[in-house]
């Protein structure tokens, strides 16, 4: 048993040995009494106090020792830390190709993170309760020997409240026993077979293989967080003092090591994964196919045969350290290797949470006060991460170019770094002497090239002269530059103090002030929508162009393949044509790749464009290098023989100039740069590059930011402070967003882009809806899950028929999900994951494509994990049977790197395959949306269907593939449908609604037309694709019921059902709500008052009751009932509607329930029994028997119509609650609606039907001036009375009519009522309302 006092330094504590009692059997009953006594608050009293005192005196020494141990244990448990909820995982963010050259790619190891927002006081109280229970529960129930080791009578006497405290000796101190040196540095477990030593030179600490309260074992957690990779076992363990290393090559990277068994010998051989275990072996007795990693990727722990897991008892007795404390302890160890848990509990200034971002701000000063600390915190965090990354023991080959600069070429591993190194980055090289470790030489250079074999070329001004030094004596470190943060902070300062930085409207719009109306710009709209080298714009693009050109602030949402680059180029061309004077257009994107692509397109349509690059990227190859500013300066310099050319030649010849010549050279170069910029029509730069001092002399009233959703809001602020008067943001917030490294900054809300915040403020984005990239079958799922079914394909199946002979399971649907069951493993860096099974299948698929004639450039491989990317690249080149150069030409990249790009065929490797650890950031719907929309002709997904299906979104995707018969397994030559049974996903939001990528709780509901592709709706939402208006008309023709008349009157009531879906068999409960609340005589109440409650589009995956059952329920409500029987009906009606699903199966259960109540409720229950039996009939049969009766019943007396009309006119709500279209037409609408109700009751009369149509048309004419309403699935209209105060709503009820049993519900007219916001009980109540 282990007990610890964490208030002591260096894992000090108490080691309590168990002493077996000689009389365990005889003392069991007494032991249970003692435990019960403790649980009852120490109220136990023995009958023989005198004997207990004698026993206490006789066993004084034993009792003192036991009591002291108990006191120390209590003190220890009081200092234990609370075990918070560990379900949250820390999502690691991966950047794209570059984000100001500071992107992160390879640290994608999901480590659990505790909630930082937990209340400290509540945590302390919960911790005390946990510690109390831990001692009296775990310490006594799990280790009974602690009590049995003492005389049980002395224990009873110890608990006697009559004993004097002096006899117990509670305060007598006892010397503490130090823990052994091999105790776990986290939890202090020190069982020899369960601990491992970290062999990093700066560490040397011991850690156990237990998890405690974390998801990874303590040794794995330490290795990952500290980036250490070498371990050794304890000298007294079963395997001795062994440093784990590869038997062949001596590799000590524990994340690469695994084991195999010899066929003829009873031995286990340790081999590294690559290259020893992946290549052929010379040892014939080794079974290379049996290789398994030493670290179980799913469990994140060492194999139990090598390092045992602490027992449950030992785990419960150990220090209960949380992941937050571990992370802080690792940070302290970087500064002080001897730091303890006591040190991390000291308050620190950086523990305070920064202020969260807001939707709107009072002024620019408040904006700056909130955002600036977040920028500084992100910069500090990035600086610490970059400067902590390094690689030692590298070998360098030196060369010298014609520019007199030196180039150092050396291999490096991308997966070993947390950041993606790209050309233009700065690195520092150091030469470490072989004796003493002294730095004898260092220099900083910039990366100029990285090839596919991970050979990096670094250009420096000098080279190391210590050629005699041994190989592997060089060290590489990353260099952090503050340029980005400095420019962002400068832009925020300008936003606050410079009035001329941007227009007044944009100032207030960015702050979220709604009072300033936009003033339309005087720009002539285009008449010709076709430009040279650009395709003709489609309807959605033309509509977006016309609205954007005259607006000072506009948003364009471009889903994948909809032509964002095309429309951006057209808008820029038109702005250049109509800008006044010397004004120029500034075009920005957050990444260099995106801005290069847009620069090339602008050059193709004939614009004078200049690409402004940073100084660090001037020597980096670019597809638009001829358009860059420094290359244009170089060309002009070569064409002439001026002073600048002479100085440049001198600098190239001698490597440097004198101080005077250098100043003159810089001045002449700057003057030429200004001349080129003045002649340009468009200047292109990254968002951070827009803050370049060379642009400070220019003003840019027209600014377009492409891919704006990938930039943080402060990053977009840099170009806007250049005199902006018109801003156009282009992007898609349902794809990947900004990349931030600091979790505190992300939690504070800075990860929300400016594009998203403006949508939340009510700015309506213009969505492009026609895509030109993907095969129609590939468009289906992304359209329905991310874009509400609006994304339609302009291409047909024949347009995307590649004529390939690849064995697709369904040739008409070129896609399939290949079910892989291989386990995931931790990558060589320890910060990522790999899946060797998926990599092997990927190589076979690539080989098949190449054999069938596909080119390497047509194939792209996407994986979310850097470790898998590196392993697939290496595995294809080693295992592929075709030419090596073919595999080298195939691009393997992360999801983030592929955003904005496309390939003919995409292979997606999901990697994650475990039972307990989850799927990490694969569950991000935006990342999945990007991965699924990169392919033009075919898509292949490799993953574990059973594991992935636990996530709701992935479950929908795999179900979609399964419904199309493309969920397969087996060999490529014989693919067959997989029989895998999908897991039941966790229900989201309590409504079964799929998440909308990039949309949060305050997302804006777009007012747009709905384009229904009529595909995939059954799979995604569990509802059919039939239009609600068509179904309503069909139902009205068949049943002629008043509820159908309400649906038939949708033109009168102006229902917006663009997004509506309806099903006769199984639909969601939210889509089956009555389209109008009715009174007992069958008239539509809300049509008299013209109150409309539009609800946002919503779908539900839960199946609900059929229309047939709702129709029966409605008919039951309309049956004439005696007044004395109203009360029983009120009691039973809510029960009847509690479970509308599967109505035909529930009838026998309800019938049994009514039969049991029949004995107690005689005549009243007998009548209800008959009504229940009538519901079993089909709607048309019931209609045939009750048609005449219903027609008479639904006839409303003319007197009541007049009274009702007068009453409604006298009780109209205030003007501010009315829509403008109702102000002048209330009386006409009431008369028309009354005529409609009368005409609909005589459905067989053609004249009345014609009158009804005329009335509909007249009402539509009266409403022609009404604004558009947002699309809804169905409109739930409630008949309510509204006073001047919204809180004083009163429901109107007619005293002459019988009341419905369910309570009435009233809501303000200005509110939107969403079906997804209703609980099941409220939904049932709304269905049965009666006025």
UniProtKB/Swiss-Prot annotation:
Residues 1-129, 1032-1150, 1180-1310 are annotated as: Disordered. GO terms for biological process: nuclear-transcribed mRNA catabolic process, nonsense-mediated decay. Phosphorylated probably by smg1. Its EC number is 3.6.4.12, 3.6.4.13. GO terms for cellular component: cytoplasm. Residues 176-336 form the Upf1 CH-rich domain. It holds the Pfam family AAA_11. ATP binds at residues 541, 558-565, 735, 772, 902. A motif ([ST]-Q motif 1) lies at residues 1174-1175. Residues 198-228 are annotated as: CC/SHH/C. Residues 67-79, 1032-1052, 1062-1091, 1112-1150, 1180-1214, 1223-1257 have a biased composition (Low complexity). Residues 1092-1111, 1258-1268, 1284-1310 have a biased composition (Polar residues). The [ST]-Q motif constitutes a recognition sequence for kinases from the PI3/PI4-kinase family. This is Regulator of nonsense transcripts 1. It comes from Dictyostelium discoideum (Social amoeba). The lineage of its organism: Eukaryota, Amoebozoa, Evosea, Eumycetozoa, Dictyostelia. The gene is upf1.
